Amino acid sequence: MPCDTADNWARYEGQDNAIMVARRGSVNSAFVTNSSQYHQAEDTNGNCFINARNDNWDNRDCNACVGHSDFSIDGVIGSGGFGSVFLGRYCGRRVAVKSVRQCSRNKEASRQSFQAEFNALLLRHDNIVSVLATTAYEDFDSGAFIIMEYAGRNLQQIVNDPGSSLSPTRRTKYALHIIRALHYTHSQGIAHLDVKPANVIVDSNTDVCRLADFGCSQRVSEGEGRDSFTSRSYLTGTFAYRAPELLRGRPPTTKADIYSYGVTLWQMLTRETPFAGENHHVVIFGVVAQNLRPSLPENANDAWYESLVTRCWEGRVADRPSAAEILLALERRTDDTENLPRDLKRRHGTT
C-alpha cells in the first residue's frame, strides 16, 4: 500500500514546512522542503532519508507504507508499554516488527505513539535503528505495525547479563554511540523522550549501539517561553529515567533526553535498576522536590565517567550539557583522558 498523501506526516508539518511523498520506481521517498527542522532531504552520504541502508538491501520492491500481507511475523522478541516486538521478514530480509498496542482507555495515546514512530522514517543515522516501513496511518484500527531493521539484543539485556563485559572502554564507546544518535536527533528538532537501555540496540556483529523506539518522541522548540510542538504529557517515557521538569508537567526539551542519558550511563556503571523496589510516588517526589538520584558506587574508580553522569542528571535544565557538548567531550576522551571534566564545566543558560 503506497503512502500517497502528506496528511500522514502532519506531525511534522507547520506553516513553513511542506512534506511531500514521491515515488521513485516502486520505492517511496520522503522529501522535506522549506523546513527549519530538516534542512535537506538527503543525509551526508547523499542518501534520501527514507531509504533503507544499502548493506546488501534491495529496495526496489519495498514501500514506505505497506499492507499486512507485505511482511511476516516469526516470533516474539520482547514487549513494552506501547506494544510488542517480533522477529519477522520483509523484502526478503530479517527485520524487527513492532506491533503498537491499542490502549482502550487512551486510544489517542496509541495513535500518537504510532504517528511518532511513523515520522521516524525521516531519521537516518548510523546510531539510530532504521524504520524501514509502517502500515498506513489510516489502517491503525485494523492493526498498526512498524518494520525496523533487526540489529541484535538491547543494552538492558547486556546490563543484566553477568557474562557480558561492560569495561570502562566499552562503556565509553557505548556512551559515544548513544550521544551521537541524540546529537543528530536534537539537531532535527526532535526529543526522543524515552532514552533507556531497553531502547538501545547493540549490533551483535559490530558492537555498535543504535537508538530505537521513537514512540514517545516529540518535535520540540528550545528557548524561554516557547512550548513544544505538541503537548503529549502521557508520552514522556519511563518514570525512573524521566527528567524532573517532565515530572512537574513542564513541556519537554532536548535536555530531558540528557537527563535520561545520564541515568542510562549510571546503569552501565552499576548494572543496577534505578530505584528498584521503591514506591513510584515516593521516587517521583524525591526526584522533583529533594533532588533524589540513584546512588553512585563508592569505589568505581572512574571519576571522569561519574562526572559525566552527575552533570547529565542535574536538576536545572540549564545546568545540563547539550548533546553537542557531550559529543565533543567524549570524542576528545578517546585521545585525552583529562579532557572530559574540563569540557563539561558548568554552563548556565536559559531553562
From Swiss-Prot:
Keywords, in A-Z order: ATP-binding, Kinase, Nucleotide-binding, Serine/threonine-protein kinase, Transferase
UniProt xrefs under Pfam families: Pkinase
Catalysed reactions, as listed in the record: L-seryl-[protein] + ATP = O-phospho-L-seryl-[protein] + ADP + H(+); L-threonyl-[protein] + ATP = O-phospho-L-threonyl-[protein] + ADP + H(+)
The EC number(s) this enzyme carries: 2.7.11.1
Active site per the UniProt annotation: 194 (proton acceptor)
Amino-acid positions noted as binding ATP in the UniProt annotation, renumbered to this chain: 77-85, 98
Record-stated family: Belongs to the protein kinase superfamily. Ser/Thr protein kinase family.
Protein name: Serine/threonine-protein kinase mos
Organism for this UniProt entry: Patiria pectinifera (Starfish)
Source species taxonomy: Eukaryota, Metazoa, Echinodermata, Eleutherozoa, Asterozoa
